[in-house]
């Protein structure tokens, strides 16, 4: 059993006014500490802060509605806010992972599904070496909404965790890793993009071995055969090695045939 770190809110990464210099002795221990919180979570008093929530609130970025100096509503690219939505969804994802189960998330618009989906995939790709982190959906426009968020969000991570792009094709595959001065490409993780094409491409996820898997907007077509084709890739002697997340929007469920 892992002994969780205890942390006060003032010590969260987002509350730090000074980040150690890259050349300082503090730099590695500082980011190793926050990496541990992103991987294992922490206790804040008697409250458990799950690892995805800590990552999401401290290191991910998205467009947040704000009021500017003239009283107008505008958007700022910054850390997400903590609402009930983020609390409930990330805790359920954490529980699904601990129980080696999948999770279905259905909700209205503005629930933060796309933001959390993008954060979840980036979280896996940033820390899980040799992992395949898969975004699947029923059509290209919905998939692109998520991949655009990941593409931008990865660029705003701390330099300590910001991988280079060895492959950078957001329609098929992005490989994170290191490019050496000698031209060698050393992969760390993959983000795979798969289009189920309203259920017509049932083998889209087959043959992969996902550590993170999202199937987005499941109400917009038949997804079940595509999901079933993916299951052997994350089935192990110890249970599911991946907790697949299936999401849908309440107003877009008319074509949902797999319930």
Question: Can you name each region flagged by the protein language model?
Answer:
Residues 1-259:
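Short, flexible loop motifs at catalytic/binding sites
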